[in-house]
Amino acid sequence: MAADVVTYTTLETFSHEDLVKPDPDASPLADHSSSGPEAEEDPSRSKRYERKRRYSKSSASSDDGSTGGGSVGGGKSGKNRKKTSKAESFEDLQNQRVLANVRERQRTQSLNEAFSSLRKIIPTLPSDKLSKIQTLKLAARYIDFLYQVLRSDDTDTKMASSCSYVAHERLSYAFSVSRQELYFGLGAPSSGPNHF
């Protein structure tokens, strides 16, 4: 009777984790043999403990088999899903890069076309090889020049009587002259006159 009580209390003191997850380095017999002199005296207690351990191991393995089997199958399908999702994400990334490159090419092409049409409108010198920023600065200067021309009363009457092509040529010539005056007025380098 006393042995039964000892066995009951011993089994109660083990936590669920101790029963389900045994120490991988120690065997159940080694744990049982190290429990003291009472374990040597009562072989039925050791058998009950081993049964309990075996039951907990088998139930844990059957639980793992039932849920783990699904998780292994699910793990494989999960791995396949991860592989396919990685492949799909890589393909999506490649497609996004290709589309971004196409959009950038189209944007650059339209920008270059706009600058070339702007260079045709702005009166330039034959020796001019303007960058984009220089083209924009020259366009701003030309707009200011046109504004000044429109403000003067003399040119308004002259431009109104002439055709638009001739007016454009006169404005272009006047703008070129003003550019040269500005160039020389700002203290151009010694190679400046050769530039024009």
UniProtKB/Swiss-Prot annotation:
Q: Where is the signal peptide?
A: none
MF GO annotations: DNA-binding transcription factor activity, RNA polymerase II-specific; protein dimerization activity; RNA polymerase II transcription regulatory region sequence-specific DNA binding
Q: Where is the composition biased (Gly residues)?
A: 66-77
Assembly, in brief, is: Efficient DNA binding requires dimerization with another bHLH protein. Homodimer.
Q: Which keywords does UniProt give here?
A: Developmental protein, Differentiation, DNA-binding, Nucleus, Transcription, Transcription regulation
Q: Report the record's Gene Ontology biological process terms.
A: cell differentiation; mesoderm development; negative regulation of cell differentiation
Where do the segments described as Disordered lie?
1-92
**Nucleotidyltransferase: present as a keyword of the record?**
no
Gene name?
A: TWIST
Q: Which GO terms describe its cellular component?
A: nucleus
**Where expressed (tissue)?**
In late gastrula embryos, expressed in the presumptive first pair of somites and the middorsal wall of the primitive gut. Expression is then up-regulated in the lateral wall of the somites and the notochord. At the late neurula stage, also expressed in the anterior wall of the primitive gut and in the evaginating lateral diverticula. In the earliest larval stage, expression is restricted to both ends of the body. In 36 hour larvae, only faint expression is detected in the notochordal and paraxial mesoderm of the caudal region.
Q: What does this protein do?
A: Probable transcription factor with a role in initial mesoderm differentiation.
Q: Name one Pfam family in it.
A: HLH
Comp. bias intervals (Basic and acidic residues): 14-24
Entry's localization field? Nucleus
Entry-linked InterPro entries: bHLH_dom, E-box_TF_Regulators, HLH_DNA-bd_sf
Organism (species)? Branchiostoma belcheri
Domain bHLH, first and last residues per copy? 95-146
Protein name per the record:
Twist-related protein
